Amino acid sequence: PQTVRGVIARSKGAPVELTDIVIPDPGPSEVTALIATCAVCHTDLTYREGGINDEFPFLLGHEAAGTVESVGEGVDSVQPGDYVVLNWRAVCGQCRACKRGRPQYCFSTFNATQKMTLTDGTELTPALGIGAFADKTLVHAGQCTKVDPAADPAVAGLLGCGVMAGLGAAVNTGAVSRGDSVAVIGCGAVGDAVIAGARLAGANKIIAVDRDAKKLEWATELGATHTVNATETDVVEAVQALTGGFGADVVIDAVGRPETWKQAFYARDLAGTVVLVGVPTPDMRLEMPLLDFFSRGGALKSSWYGDCLPERDFPVLIDLHLQGRLPLDKFVTERISLDDVEKAFHTMHAGEVLRSVVVW
């Protein structure tokens, strides 16, 4: 076992702490990863607030890149020294979804078997089975996806969660294709990743919708061709006006509230596609005329982790970034140290950054 530093959430809503944690030596199918970078994602804040479950204390952090330090028995997919992005979809290959050729819906994904602990032996729950706000972490070998080591780890690690969620919502779930018109509601990091994905897929018109002028600026930098400030205009009318009165082919809700989903529903073209990627809270309800669903046709989808397969998608997206076709570096607003995580939660909540990235 090794003792390293890690950022933990000890109790609901309490500020996070930087403390010593114990990492076991990797057992069968497990890997110890040396963390190079880990971005601050809203999901970490949700863990701290008790919004995922109440299995405190949590070892936070999951959007990470680094190198494999050591491997356990039976691991042949990676070896010490490999440059990897960590993922939380290590598919099992055996469940119903995997066997039907839909591994992105795998419901038996792998995590490390052994528990990381505090120095007093208290077991930690790693965020999304990763726990990467730490000098090192213990994961399942399938959670390590090899990518080109030429990529800056601060950039590569973003694919571990939010940026992949957005890119995949456009490219995989929404199936945006050349010449499409796309509207994106909510232009934080996930929404901007949707925009980058739509641009990559060849969308002709990309309409960014937000209430914050600064976020609309970021959206333009990432490829939006038009912007709509939702505080100043009716979103549905604005999207229709920008698409010849028809509505967009694909509308992606990166907020996840009843009112934004309704905007997405009515802002799409007849038989268009709506993709929900923003995460609603359990108490949110939607009331709409059922006839509107019947009469408009099309597809209503949700996207979880961008319907990605890490081993298929991460290397390709990193290659596209290195070719200059996917500006992942624009998501990195600031680079911070491990003891700045609590402060970064406040900066993120205030909408002042796309991503704060902890760099070792």
Curated annotation (Swiss-Prot):
Catalysed reactions listed for this entry: S-(hydroxymethyl)mycothiol + NAD(+) = S-formylmycothiol + NADH + H(+)
An annotated GO cellular component: cytosol
Any single Pfam family the record assigns to this protein: ADH_N
Enzyme class label: oxidoreductase
Residues reported to bind Zn(2+) 2: 92, 95, 98, 106
Domain of life: Bacteria
CC cofactor note: Binds 2 Zn(2+) ions per subunit.
Obligatory cofactor(s): Zn(2+)
Xref: InterPro entries: ADH-like_C, ADH-like_N, ADH_Zn_CS, GroES-like_sf, MycoS_dep_FDH, NAD(P)-bd_dom_sf
Subunit structure: Homotrimer.
NCBIfam families: mycoS_dep_FDH (TIGR03451)
Family label: Belongs to the zinc-containing alcohol dehydrogenase family.
Protein name stated in the entry: S-(hydroxymethyl)mycothiol dehydrogenase
Taxonomic path: Bacteria, Bacillati, Actinomycetota, Actinomycetes, Pseudonocardiales
